């Protein structure tokens, strides 16, 4: 952009130029006629050369002037100071479409392509006109300024699609940014003053001048970038097939003395442009806001809409999007320049060269080459990846930029740096192995320079298909070959020490670890760069091939891109720090890079390397190496001169390197620009990973087993009584002095039964809510999960979902029949054992339902044996709310499952809930007829003698099977009509009875002996000739029969009235706490009454006196059996019975009625004695002759 002057002379000059162009508009028709005439005259007339040229120049100049005048008339509307003029220009400007503005430039495209001077004059004129208008409209309003700025915004965005098409077509790689979005390529200025588009010092001056001018941001932005675009175009035209010149000519082409300053200046310009674009966006937003406010005001007042304002609103919305796109483009360019600066600094660090910021900085050609390469690579990292079709169109020649763009992912900083180093090492490898057999990868693609003399290597940042012209007045551009030669010169002089370096490098590469370099920040280390930087970094034989892709098998030479993670000895000596997102790039083994690579074995080594390498070798690499080696082979003389000149610059460093070369065999070179890595070698790491994998598997298995064992214990939901206990326990503990749990539970149980139905219903509702919540929290939970054995649960995991076929078979008797149909339960269910039906359905081989089962020793138990076995287990105390001696059911029964009777319900644990039907446990009915004389021991505290008034010959055989409790509890006999037998598994079956009095005496003695020893009495069998019932019916008091003892001989026994032993009502389950029926009568205390002795006139009364004295003695002494007293009384009683029962014909009738005794203890009694309640069936006339009695 020219200097935007502010003096009057410059303003007048610009105005004169405008007037002169406007005057030439009148010659438009005349020039059209001359056009036709001149075309005819050129063929027929003889015109001198000078005249012809003048005429031709005049005609073309007139055409350009004509189009420029049209542009100025249609586009550049200079606002005037009058308000009418401002409104008119404002309206016309905003309503003019984009096509109308850009149409004149599109029609003049062909002429402007070859008229660069006129093209520059038009842009300069355009700039002067705009500057003049800006100076004249200082007192104008903000809307005028905004309108002009919006005009240029539309102008700049009009050709975006066309520019993108040209950019993609020619594969342009620009220094200052790809895809310039300001102006078309055909409109760019031609300034042949620069040899490169990034080292033009005049451009910097123009930028500084443009910043000093008070120009709008958009015009400044467009002017800066149109100059940059024109430089790119001029470089494209000037780029030619390079001839390798002498050292002086090569060094004179680089004049970037302050590369970092130049890059930073570009960044500053972009920052300034961004700020001004933001200001423009703010101004546009304010204008849109004011317009919307005015529009709403018009709609309210007039109810009409202005077409002009609607058009302005649409244009403003479009301009807003254009400004946003420009801001994104500026940000992208800024990031690109920032990347270029970073690449440049990092490259200097890796080469060990000082930067501009250091005090010892001296400009060298290497600095210039690194700067150019950094700018090109920064642009390459931002460009999108090209498709494979683009590469397939040009298989013969591949540019370096095409090689860069084949990576699937954006390259990191070190990857881009290593690309340059790999190319340099490829050149050196070709030089070092030129005397020997070349590389297999290179020999296939290398062609002689004579065969390809016409095909020139392409420029690193220019088109691959353009024809380059030779211009003597233009400095040559830097090409890829020149950049590679500069790097090759750095290591060419170090070939003398190659064998030593290979030996040390082979030692280093044995411990090479997989690494990936993702560090983006320049890190400077205070190592001695003088001794190991230059000649080692690019030595070809020390540099293996790397791949950016993971370790995958190779699918072909062109299946991917090997970006060449080559960093020489620095990439092999140390390990880089692995970032969290780093990909592990497997490093090739370096056994093939021994000294025999120089001695003619290069072919075999590279072949083996390619076979065992998991990396992917890419075709673009071969093409580039072919391109480089082909160029080098044709200019050995120029290359030698260039190498000698570059070697002089690093003479001191090479001397230091030669001095330290002897120690390289044993020393490990430090990593210059990479942090320290704490990882281990690849083999060790692989072994550790395998060991870690196995240990993890074992630990996971152990964790699973421990998790199974440590599963949380889920408690059952509390029932109504437990909720009541939880609520009232604290109160009872506070009232009672005793803190024993059993006593407190007795009190709570008694109080629970004293509650009314309404009071209990509250807790039943709470229990229902508790169950519902438990089901929601733990779906699928079962009580088996807590109480079932883990091994059994694992072996048989049943499906809890019931099916139509066998769903009912998986239920137990309690869930299948309910509490009201206990007669249909199996025997184990009535005894709170495992259900036979359930076990059969679960296993298929359970016990049969006929009542027989197996004990723990495997022997089959009959009904009688099973009753005895169960009775022994149920003989314990039940004073607490939880039956500790009871095995829990393992099924998920109904949540209203009953609990054992709490509190002081002594003896209730041996009772089964009554029913209207006879229990299956006692299938025999009681007969009410008179029975024979039977001495019936009930427990260790009481003796029952049952007599019969029938003769012995008429007595029927009976079998009495009893099982007494080992605890010191009092048993009783009671007959209650319409009640079932007790739960105590005692049954009486028919059998032979003892017919003689001697046998009866023996039975009585045996009972007393067992009673004294605290043992269960054995089975006693008595036989008679005739079957008679045990008891004789008598009138009842409160539904309880009173046994009236018949006369003994000629005397009679007077028996006191028995207490009222009322049973719970029909349908009430005394063991079911959740049953709302009142069972408080079961908790009533009963007092023990002394046994009244009945005087008898006959000699048989001695037996009753003896038995009664024993019972009284035992009861008074706290229910403890006195062995000595029992033994003495037994002997006396046995002797008397033997003497007085010799006459078998006498009718002996003796009946001793022992009343029930209840312990009158307090609520907090220390001992909880179990009480046994014996119930018998009522007399039935039509019942069978068999009888049953149950005693515990």
UniProtKB/Swiss-Prot annotation:
Name of the protein in its database record: Protein pangolin, isoform J
Q: Where is this motif: Nuclear localization signal?
A: 351-357
Q: Which organism is it from?
A: Drosophila melanogaster (Fruit fly)
What's the stated role of this polypeptide?
Segment polarity protein. Functions together with arm to transduce the Wingless (Wg) signal in embryos and in developing adult tissues. Acts as a transcriptional activator, but in the absence of arm, it binds to gro and acts as a transcriptional repressor of wg-responsive genes.
Write out the GO biological process terms.
Answer: canonical Wnt signaling pathway; cell elongation involved in imaginal disc-derived wing morphogenesis; chitin-based larval cuticle pattern formation; digestive tract morphogenesis; embryonic pattern specification; heart development; imaginal disc-derived wing morphogenesis; mesodermal cell fate determination
Record keywords: Activator, Developmental protein, DNA-binding, Nucleus, Repressor, Segmentation polarity protein, Transcription, Transcription regulation, Wnt signaling pathway
Compositional bias per record (Low complexity), positions renumbered to this chain: 898-915, 957-986
Its lineage reads: Eukaryota, Metazoa, Ecdysozoa, Arthropoda, Hexapoda
Which stretches does UniProt call biased (Polar residues)?
A: 1140-1162, 1170-1192
Pfam families recorded: HMG_box
**Gene from which this protein is expressed:** pan
